[in-house]
């Protein structure tokens, strides 16, 4: 190659480089005119993705907290159900045994000739049986309600009648026709009573 050819080739290369630089400058100017800078665009996109990610994290944390609260509520309800089952599982049995208690009390209330030794020992046996039965049901949370002189409470007493009675204030129980019973504080049978008017 001759010097002339090399010189022409160098000039062409220089012109090409100038032309490329001019194009890049024009592209940058066009982008600047359009207001789109690739770096700014990338920064905006990253910020947008960060905001989306933050929102998703908040939603997931909220979901997690709600799930935990729901699990706690389910566990608490299950514990309460088990506790109620323990407390009141004997309710049907307790209601059924109340008739036996009533019958034993009626047997002891009947007039009898207690001078006869066999009748006296029979009454003593019934009395001991009743005491043992009452002690047993008491251990399981059954308690009697309805005592003469007590103030009438409609939650645990059922008034059969109201009559004026000397020696009693208004709303006091004058006669207990049938004892009532509670099982762990819950009424399983209200006491049937007469109340002073």
Curated annotation (Swiss-Prot):
Residues 1-34 are annotated as: Disordered. Participates actively in the response to hyperosmotic and heat shock by preventing the aggregation of stress-denatured proteins, in association with DnaK and GrpE. It is the nucleotide exchange factor for DnaK and may function as a thermosensor. Unfolded proteins bind initially to DnaJ; upon interaction with the DnaJ-bound protein, DnaK hydrolyzes its bound ATP, resulting in the formation of a stable complex. GrpE releases ADP from DnaK; ATP binding to DnaK triggers the release of the substrate protein, thus completing the reaction cycle. InterPro entries: GrpE (IPR000740), GrpE_coiled_coil (IPR013805), GrpE_head (IPR009012). SUPFAM superfamilies: Coiled-coil domain of nucleotide exchange factor GrpE, Head domain of nucleotide exchange factor GrpE. The gene is grpE. It is found in: Cytoplasm. The keyword Transcription regulation does not apply. Pfam families: GrpE. PANTHER family: GRPE PROTEIN, GRPE PROTEIN HOMOLOG, MITOCHONDRIAL. This is Protein GrpE. Belongs to the GrpE family. GO terms for molecular function: adenyl-nucleotide exchange factor activity; protein homodimerization activity; protein-folding chaperone binding; unfolded protein binding. It comes from the Bacteria. Keywords: Chaperone, Cytoplasm, Stress response. GO terms for biological process: protein folding. Residues 1-27 have a biased composition (Basic and acidic residues).
